[in-house]
């Protein structure tokens, strides 16, 4: 159900917005889930993927392969990973693009901006968890029973 009247439900408009999205929006759309240990450590489920992150492919032809992200190719919506290549007919090797949603981040490249992003996301998640289940107090429930 749509709550905000300014948000379109039109398939045509959503596809246009997706495929003409600027690089700054594509960065967020090209996010990948974190591994279980990173998720527990940082209390964050996913992050925008970035060059020099270490990832593991979890779906597709290259499932199980691991490597470092060499390039995030936002124009093509793919990432290039070390050692995931294909040999062309003329003998040269080219990187094969992998969808960011098909990989899992196993090691983050952290700098001050990324650390602050992790903190912000973790704080927001902690606040949401704290509010969860406190919509009604026990007294409110018992009041309405009678």
UniProtKB/Swiss-Prot annotation:
This is Large ribosomal subunit protein uL24y. It comes from Arabidopsis thaliana (Mouse-ear cress). GO terms for molecular function: RNA binding; structural constituent of ribosome. Residues 119-138 have a biased composition (Basic and acidic residues). Keywords: Ribonucleoprotein, Ribosomal protein. Pfam families: KOW, Ribosomal_L26. GO terms for cellular component: cytosolic large ribosomal subunit; cytosolic ribosome; plastid. The gene is RPL26B. The keyword Ribonucleoprotein applies. Residues 9-18 have a biased composition (Basic residues). Belongs to the universal ribosomal protein uL24 family. One of its GO terms (biological process) is translation. Residues 1-20, 119-146 are annotated as: Disordered. PANTHER family: 60S RIBOSOMAL PROTEIN L26 FAMILY MEMBER.
């Amino acid at each position: 159900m749509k709550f905000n009247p300014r948000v379109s439900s039109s398939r045509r408009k959503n596809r246009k917005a997706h495929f003409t999205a600027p690089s700054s929006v594509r960065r967020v759309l090209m996010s990948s889930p974190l591994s279980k240990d990173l998720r527990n450590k940082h209390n964050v489920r996913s992050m925008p993927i970035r060059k020099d992150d270490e990832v593991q492919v979890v779906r597709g032809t290259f499932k199980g392969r691991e490597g470092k992200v060499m390039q995030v190719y936002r124009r093509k919506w793919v990432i290039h990973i070390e050692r995931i290549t294909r040999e062309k007919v003329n003998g040269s090797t080219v990187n094969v693009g992998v969808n960011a949603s098909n990989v899992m981040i196993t090691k983050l490249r952290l700098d001050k901006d990324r650390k602050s992003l992790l903190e912000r996301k973790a704080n927001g998640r902690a606040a949401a968890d704290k509010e969860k289940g406190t919509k009604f107090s026990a007294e409110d429930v018992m009041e309405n029973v009678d």
